[in-house]
Amino acid sequence: MEIGGLVYLVIVVAIIHSSQGVDYCKIRCPSGIHTVCQYGESTKPSKNCAGKVIKSVGPTEEEKKLIVSEHNRFRQKVAQGLETRGNPGPQPAASDMNDLVWNDELAHIAQVWASQCQFLVHDKCRNTAKYPVGQNIAYAGGSKLPDVVSLIKLWENEVKDFNYNTGITKQNFAKIGHYTQMVWGKTKEIGCGSLKYMENKMQNHYLICNYGPAGNYLGQLPNTKK
């Protein structure tokens, strides 16, 4: 164990679901009812968070800017053909890489789910009336609080295992799914929820980011080669 370093980390990623609707309780997903319909609009930590000393709910304004800028920095690196890592690398330049903007609705849905303290689990339905929504989750702790950039780097670093020629398959998805959602060319918006809390003398940071339109369709490539 390294003092001041990360003591543990877990990252998970979801394959998308599609649905349409306006009222959250009318939005249908193949695997369950919508998060906001099930838990309501409140972002107050639920009873599942008992035993955790909650320090803050939701990303700060500065963290929101960092989340967007870190995603766009990396997306443009890939789009310009400057990402040398891969299996094999380098990653090809992309012709359809949108810059992401923050979306408060995506962030609210992500925060409602984050505040349920059901760690390492994706919600069953998070779509909006506008589009299907993808999701990345990171969860880390240590003697010092991991910052939001270090969590995003965990997703970014999965590029080392990605073979662009293969695309997304059931076999490789667990290793590369965060990366591919990060650089899904047609995704335009992002919104994230978070919890920072103390437990067993450890400082923990839990981050959920929702993406729209979603990426990570099996059998497809994350972006179009230039």
Curated annotation (Swiss-Prot):
GO terms for cellular component: extracellular region. SMART domains: SCP. SUPFAM superfamilies: PR-1-like. The keyword Disulfide bond applies. The keyword Membrane does not apply. It is found in: Secreted. Its main location: secreted. This is Venom allergen 5. It comes from Polistes exclamans (Paper wasp).
